[in-house]
Amino acid sequence: MAYEPMKPTKAGLEAPLEQIHKIRITLSSKNVKNLEKVCTDLVRGAKDKRLRVKGPVRMPTKVLKITTRKAPCGEGTNTWDRFELRVHKRVIDLFSSPDVVKQITSITIEPGVEVEVTIADS
């Protein structure tokens, strides 16, 4: 099998080596519509900058339940209220330098959406 020779580059014309990090953006919210809107905005912004993107990965929804008696006193029929809170979560992985991610995450984030950014060496 023959290998194609590498093209020599002129001295001083090499591409500047920029430190690439794996950046994990974790989004969580009670409102799915707002969460999906922020996800699409982030992914669209990253693809406009030509970054490598993985996600959004849908994590399992956490359902927090509280069951309580309706009657304030202990008398009467046992009737119960069941309340629940659903927390939805999305994870997006980006591969780029931190200052590019700072530009991408400067978008307007919908109310009620929690954003957590973690940077690691890839």
UniProtKB/Swiss-Prot annotation:
GO CC, alphabetical: cytosol; cytosolic ribosome; cytosolic small ribosomal subunit; nucleolus; plant-type cell wall; plasmodesma
Signal peptide per UniProt: none
Keywords attached to this entry: Ribonucleoprotein, Ribosomal protein
Highest taxon in the source lineage: Eukaryota
One annotated GO molecular function: structural constituent of ribosome
Entries under InterPro entries matching the protein: Ribosomal_uS10, Ribosomal_uS10_CS, Ribosomal_uS10_dom, Ribosomal_uS10_dom_sf, Ribosomal_uS10_euk/arc
One GO BP annotation of this record: translation
Entry similarity comment: Belongs to the universal ribosomal protein uS10 family.
HAMAP family listed in its UniProt record: Ribosomal_uS10
Protein name: Small ribosomal subunit protein uS10y
Organism: Arabidopsis thaliana (Mouse-ear cress)
